[in-house]
Regions:
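Residue-level recognition of alpha-helix termini/interfacial anchor residues
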Residues: 102-106, 110-113
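N-terminal intrinsically disordered, low-complexity tails
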Residues: 17-25
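Long internal repeat-built scaffold domains in very large eukaryotic proteins
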Residues: 3-4, 8, 24, 33-41, ...
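Helix-loop-helix module between adjacent transmembrane segments
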Residues: 426-427
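Long, N-terminal intrinsically disordered regulatory "head" regions
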Residues: 2, 6-10, 14-18
Length: 826
């Protein structure tokens, strides 16, 4: 064995999906005449190399020739020199080390020679070199790198560089997390163990052992709050809590019964209970010029926009100035008047908006929506059914009133009422995997007489209810629909949501989607590629898988025939996969900006939505500027997508800069009904819940991703890929699916009886302290406030008093505080 080299030699940091090498011993092309372009190109290529690089290249080529020398002594020297060059090559993380670059053309030659070598130490040395070269050369799926590693010499593989070591094993992250889980359990840090269990949920880790490992009832209540925030619905059985009162208390917390109460406590503390009207949001008096005198253009559409703005702004407050007024005791009150200022399907959205205003308060909500269920107007009934779903979103109840009320209306013949009922069920039971819902909705999918729109909404609702479950029966039903429909039907804009419904079943489940993806290759060519890309991007959502991002970027770089639409979902897929961590997200933003410059039109239309998803409820200045530029784009679809995305990145932040941009856009587009509608929706989103809500699917210090919240966002974004036909058409009520992602961005500290407890906390920018020894500062640039407080994107809170101890390490949402027995007041 030759002496070991510097163990930090970074031997390779190339992507494994680089082009496949040329076949072994490919004949060199003959030089062309001097006049030909080829010669000049070759000369130019060599001119680009510095003298040092040129010398290295020639040296390596000499080693390749000598490595095939019949004399073992010469061979050994050449191989050792080559090993040394590769191992001592240092490079940045993003580029291929030079020795690998220069050896690339000779990979085939060395591979072919390796097969002819007799068994010896020299053959092992050659295998080591080929193993490292295979990182950048071998075809995907061949696993040549591992193959040559096994044949090669035993020993310290770390000396070839950490990228090489990282690339060799299959993903070990799951086993590492399981070990972390076991360590947390062993040392009694159950709250952190629960966070890991939620991350690996459905992948073999159960939640019950965490509850049974402790007898501390207060701690169990804190676990219940964490699970409720994640959106999981689990049953509390006798093993978790033997006492009936304790069992009921835990079930109430997991069912989110306390959410509305906590949210309103925050609102009262911040003094934002006063209802706001759409006019308060538009702030027309601040606009100078033409948009100030509100145009009477398409007043029904303006009323519809006002309905959405009103619903978004007053979400969860239980009162507003349009739908819930004191004279509301009779249906002839002003809420009735506003309802009938909308036309046809606009009335459905208006009635459903009441559900959003009363969000999470199911008792009061169901009582107020009940009167609309008995209306003679089918659109009002449909809206009421959707409203029942919205008000019950994330809130479970023993008697299941939402299912009882909604399922009564399935027998109605009117298409709009059925859609209201179907979407209502999807929103109310998202993530619950409730069997009764499956039976009801599958009946629509298997009925060949049902209109297309009912098929699509049934599939979407099934996708939401069974999100991430990999449920074979539901998948099979949706696949049958996709196979049986004719080409003209598949060309309908709304049909693009069927592959999304199928993808939701595999959200974040990675390889589990492969069997279904194979089946999708047999679909009609109209929808085949769209389905394939959508399935892949949803299955790898939130994983940060670089290879899949590369594949999607490859799809975006193709030049398509007219009529192909699958590049839109590919662009969304890039942000879906890359949103997992900060660095990946920043790199994706850069890639998306390149696509804006060089991409085809259908790619440019999706880029604003992808950026909106990457920075949701997190208004970054560079993304904001890009959106501002695109909102004036010559292509109407691009500018509308950019306007909606301005709303998404500012969702629930009350960001003054975005609010100003949107006001200017409302005057710029005052004659364009479609654009103005988008501006209004964006204004409503920016002031979501008067600035108390977020749409971000990440929580618990960006460690956990709520699949239900992500499912809601993905569905709406795919609908926005065809803004004119879906959101600006008659399916505007799809915007209510965003309810699934709405969560208060609060820190509410409570005592052991769950009564609000005001304590001082420091709130500042989170600092990444992973791997640092001791107790480093976890936040920077903090301010001290008294709870309850709001947490913006990227902020973290810590207690500023030692009087209490929190029962969870991550201060977000509901946090139970316990008195510190060792604390003595001076």
């Amino acid at each position: 064995m030759p002496p070991r080299e510097d163990p930090n030699g970074d031997a390779s940091s190339a992507s494994p999906s680089d082009p496949v090498p040329p076949p072994p011993q490919q004949p060199q092309p003959q030089p062309q005449p001097a006049k030909g372009k080829g010669k000049k190109k070759d000369e130019k290529k060599d001119d680009d190399l510095s003298e040092e690089d040129q010398a290295l290249k020639e040296q390596l080529e000499l080693y390749v020739v000598r490595a095939q020398d019949p004399d073992p002594g010469v061979q050994k020297l050449a191989l050792e020199s080559m090993r040394q060059e590769i191992r001592s090559a240092t490079s940045s993380m993003t580029s291929v080390p030079k020795p690998l670059k220069f050896l690339r053309p000779h990979y085939g030659t060395l591979k072919a020679y390796f097969e002819t070598m007799p068994e010896s130490d020299l053959k092992k040395y050659m295998a080591d070199i080929l193993s490292v070269l295979a990182l950048t050369m071998s075809a995907e799926g061949e696993r040549e790198s591992l193959n040559y590693r096994m044949i090669g010499s035993e020993g310290d593989i770390g000396s070839w560089g950490h990228e090489y070591v990282r690339y060799l094993p299959a993903p070990d992250d799951m086993s590492a997390l399981k070990i972390a889980f076991e360590i947390y359990m062993k040392f009694g840090d159950f709250a952190n163990a629960l966070r890991i269990a939620l991350l690996l949920y459905d992948k073999s880790l159960e939640l019950k052992p965490i509850f049974t490992a402790t007898d501390d009832f207060q701690l169990k209540k804190q676990f219940a709050f964490i699970i409720a925030r994640h959106g999981l619905s689990i049953e509390i059985d006798d093993d978790i809590a033997a006492d009936e009162n304790e069992k009921e208390a835990l079930q109430d917390i997991i069912s989110n019964i306390k959410l509305s109460e906590g949210y309103l406590t925050l609102a009262r503390d911040i003094e934002v209970m006063e209802p706001k009207s759409p006019e308060d949001i538009y702030k027309v008096h601040l606009i100078d010029g033409r948009g100030a005198t509100s145009s009477s253009l398409d007043s029904a559409r303006q009323n519809l926009a006002a309905t959405f703005v009103n619903a978004f702004v007053n979400a969860g407050f239980g009162q507003d100035k349009l739908m819930t007024t004191p004279s509301d005791s009779s249906s002839s009150g002003s809420s009735g008047n506003w309802l009938f200022k909308n036309k046809e399907h606009g009335k459905a959205s208006a009635a459903a908006s009441l559900g959003m205003i009363l969000l999470w308060d199911s008792d009061s909500g169901l009582a107020q929506l009940d009167k609309y269920l008995h209306s003679n107007d089918i659109h009002v009934v449909a809206g009421a059914l959707l409203g029942i779903g919205i008000v019950s979103c994330g809130v479970k109840s023993d008697c299941d009133p939402a299912f009882a009320l909604i399922s009564e209306c399935f027998s109605r013949d009117e298409s709009i009422i059925r859609i209201g009922a179907i979407l209502g069920l999807g929103i109310a039971y998202a993530g619950s995997q409730k069997e009764e819902v499956r039976e009801n909705l599958t009946a629509f999918l298997t009925d060949s007489q049902v209109p297309l729109e009912i098929l699509v909404f049934s599939a979407i609702s099934l996708g939401l209810v069974f999100v991430g479950s990999c449920n074979e029966e539901v998948a099979q039903t949706i696949i049958c629909v996709l196979m049986e429909r004719s080409e003209p039907e598949l060309a309908e804009p709304i049909m693009r949501l069927l592959p999304v419904a199928l993808g939701l079943l595999y959200l974040g489940k990675q390889e589990s989607v492969e069997a279904t993806a194979e089946v999708s290759k047999t679909f009609d060519e109209k929808i085949r590629n769209y389905c394939d890309v959508t399935l892949m991007s949803l299955a790898y959502a939130g994983t940060g898988n670089v290879l899949k991002v590369q594949k999607l970027l490859g799809i975006c770089s193709e030049h398509l025939e007219k009529g192909e639409t699958h590049q839109g979902p590919a662009v969304l897929g890039i942000s879906l996969i890359a949103m997992a961590e900060e660095l990946g997200a920043e790199m994706a933003v850069r890639s998306l900006e390149r696509l804006l410059q060089y991409g085809e039109q259908n790619i440019r239309r999706a880029v604003p939505l992808a950026l909106g998803l990457l920075c949701i409820s997190n208004p970054k200045v560079n993304v904001m500027d890009t959106m501002s530029r695109l909102s004036h784009d010559a292509d109407a679809e691009v500018s509308m997508a950019a306007i909606i995305s301005l709303g998404l990145i500012g969702a629930g932040t009350n960001n003054a800069r975005i609010a100003g941009m949107l006001r200017n856009l409302s005057s710029y587009y005052y004659k364009e009904a479609g654009h103005l509608f988008c501006v209004r929706i964006a204004q409503g989103l920016v002031h979501l819940g008067k600035g108390l809500l977020t749409l971000s699917p990440y929580h618990s210090d960006r460690f956990l991703l709520s699949p239900i919240a992500l499912a809601g966002l993905v569905t709406v974004l795919h609908a926005c890929l065809d803004m004119k036909s879906i959101i600006l058409g008659k399916y505007h009520y799809m915007l209510y699916i965003l309810t699934l992602a709405m969560q208060p961005r609060m820190l509410l500290t409570v005592d052991e009886d769950l009564k609000p407890l005001s304590v001082p906390v420091r709130v500042g920018q989170a600092v990444d302290v992973v791997g640092q020894a001791g107790r480093p500062k976890t936040i920077t640039g903090f301010q001290t406030h008294s709870t309850p407080v709001l947490l913006a994107a990227g902020e973290r809170a810590e207690l500023a008093t030692e009087k209490y101890l929190p029962l969870t390490p991550v201060l977000e949402g509901f946090v139970i505080l316990r008195k510190n027995p060792e604390y003595h007041e001076d």
